[in-house]
Amino acid sequence: MKIIVLMMMLFAAFSAVVLADKSIEDAALDTVMDRDDDKKECIGHMGWCAWTDGECCEGYRCKLWCRKIIDWLG
């Protein structure tokens, strides 16, 4: 009986540590992701751009989806 109680207490302690670690990790990621809020979002290579408000990234143009601008004449 003592072993069962000990195992339950160890399981509860381990679960608490894991949950605390996960919440700290999520909080750290939230602060990192918030730094890019000032950047304008753009649609990258092969991203659907037709009939949307988004614009293609620099060096791409919209022809149903964002395609790379190729300068054939050099």
UniProtKB/Swiss-Prot annotation:
GO molecular function annotation: sodium channel regulator activity; toxin activity
Tissue-by-tissue expression: Expressed by the venom gland.
Keyword Transmembrane helix attributed: no
Modified-residue entries (Leucine amide), positions: L73
Keywords per UniProt: Amidation, Disulfide bond, Ion channel impairing toxin, Knottin, Neurotoxin, Secreted, Signal, Toxin, Voltage-gated sodium channel impairing toxin
Stored SUPFAM superfamilies: omega toxin-like
Signal peptide (UniProt feature, chain positions): 1-20
Keyword Disulfide bond attributed: yes
Propeptide boundaries: 21-35
Disulphide-bridged cysteine pairs: C42-C57, C49-C62, C56-C66
Main location: secreted
Cellular component, GO, one term: extracellular region
Localization per record: Secreted
Domain topic, free-text comment: The presence of a 'disulfide through disulfide knot' structurally defines this protein as a knottin.
General function of this protein: Weakly nhibits voltage-gated sodium channels Nav1.7/SCN9A. High concentration of the toxin (3 uM) inhibits Nav1.7/SCN9A currents by 80%.
Family statement drawn from the similarity comment of this UniProt entry: Belongs to the neurotoxin 10 (Hwtx-1) family.
Name of the featured protein: Mu-Sparatoxin-Hp2
